[in-house]
């Protein structure tokens, strides 16, 4: 049997979070090793599902796309990224344990773009590359795993092509932050499709995208499988996923923002365009 449903971005994030938390390798890393969950809107949902408790999701991020611009939340407004070791939350920054990571340990990182070839794009504003600069090369050198959570709303034609453009020193003008883009060709993307197939004995396809009236950025999916599994999946979607509210979003004052690569840096609220006030 086939079944069809549509998910808003918030609903997709909740589904991805539940799918990530159900992965045996994530459960193993949480119980027996290190599990690092980097900041991001989607990874915040993953963290809630992994911990089984509420997280201040709108502050569990650094870079964000908010009010129609690329933006960075002030460091003082951000929640600390969570590092788990053998089931316990460590009161440390993830970078302090980077050299301790070994086989079975996992980093969960959000993505900003995805293409049909499985390439993941990660936006970078920090001159040192942010999380990518701190973890990617070291993890790659040791053959360790980073799972990139990325919703299908972020599909673009080619991450490889997009990554040839941009860069904070190469962009002459911008509305919002200037940024570069890393193309991760060897990562493990985890989308709504992966979540559905991790949770149920079904196959899933991305059927359509878009919407309005609160469904902007929505994705429509079809699942197919045995009747009982499809029914179980649809009951889950209706009971656990549909109706997930959108995050309100938190934007710091442009006046005191430390990010230099933004045309709004240093501006008082009265000098900002209406969509940013």
Model-derived segments and their meaning:
Residues 2-85:
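N-terminal active-site beta-alpha-beta segment that forms phosphate/nucleotide-binding
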Residues 277:
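Long, contiguous binding/interaction regions
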Residues 61-66, 244-255:
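A generic structural motif
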Residues 47-52, 122, 250, 258-260:
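Compositionally biased, intrinsically disordered low-complexity regions enriched
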Residues 1-2, 7-15, 77-245, 254-271:
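Conserved phosphate- and dinucleotide-binding cores of soluble alpha/beta proteins
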């Amino acid at each position: 049997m086939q079944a069809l449903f549509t998910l808003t971005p918030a609903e997709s994030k909740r589904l991805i979070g539940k799918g990530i938390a159900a992965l045996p390798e994530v459960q193993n890393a949480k119980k027996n090793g290190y599990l690092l969950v980097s900041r991001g809107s989607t990874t915040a949902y993953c963290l809630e599902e992994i911990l089984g408790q509420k997280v201040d999701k709108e502050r569990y991020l650094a870079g964000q796309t908010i009010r129609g611009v690329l933006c960075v939340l002030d460091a003082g407004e951000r929640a600390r990224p969570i590092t788990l070791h053998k089931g316990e939350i460590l009161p440390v920054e993830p970078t302090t344990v980077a050299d301790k990571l070994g086989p079975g340990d996992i980093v969960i990182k959000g993505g900003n773009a995805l293409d049909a070839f499985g390439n993941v794009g990660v936006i970078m504003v920090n001159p040192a590359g942010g999380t990518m600069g701190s973890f990617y090369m070291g993890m790659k050198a040791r053959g360790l795993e980073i799972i990139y959570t990325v919703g299908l709303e972020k599909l673009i034609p080619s991450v490889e092509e997009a990554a040839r453009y941009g860069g904070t020193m190469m962009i002459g003008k911008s509305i919002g932050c200037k940024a570069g883009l890393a193309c991760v060709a060897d990562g493990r993307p985890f989308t709504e499709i992966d979540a559905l197939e991790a949770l149920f004995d079904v196959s899933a396809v991305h059927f359509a995208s878009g919407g309005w009236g609160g469904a902007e950025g929505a994705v429509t999916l079809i699942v197919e499988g045995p009747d009982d599994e499809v029914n179980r999946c649809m009951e889950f979607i209706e009971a656990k996923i549909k109706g997930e509210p959108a995050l309100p979003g938190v934007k710091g004052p442009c006046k005191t923002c430390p990010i230099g690569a933004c045309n709004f840096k240093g501006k008082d609220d009265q000098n900002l365009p209406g969509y940013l006030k």
